[in-house]
Amino acid sequence: MRVLVTGAGGFIGHHLTNFLVGRGCWVRGVDLHQPEYAASAAHEFLQLDLRHWENTLIATRDVDQVYHLAANMGGIGFISSHKAEIVRDSGLINLHTLEAARVNGVQRFLFSSSACVYPSYRQDSPDVTPLKEEDALPADPED
């Protein structure tokens, strides 16, 4: 099985890459940056900006599955002061990667989202119950 992990330089992507390699998958890791704390276990690691269509075509070429974790993100200070930039960049990354996967005949595509899609009233309760996908609706944007 040939697998692409986008966001492979990040915390979750790094651990997912290790897991998939341990399961016998050939893994291509892609990230805007090299992993900061430890070398990637990916068989191939490409440093690509997935906001650009051509790079997503390169990233998704010759793989069977995509685990899509890449996004423009940062700490709360960055997020709070760069909202439009984050929406634009993450939108481009998501749309380009999904379409490139389709064009390149990828069989499976896993999209990883964020707990931030859930309304804050579902996150603030001390009564912690597992959230379901449909709990994100109706949408309740903060700003």
Features from the language model and the residues they span:
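N-terminal Rossmann-like NAD(P)+-binding domain of SDR-like oxidoreductases, especially those catalyzing
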Residues: 1-143
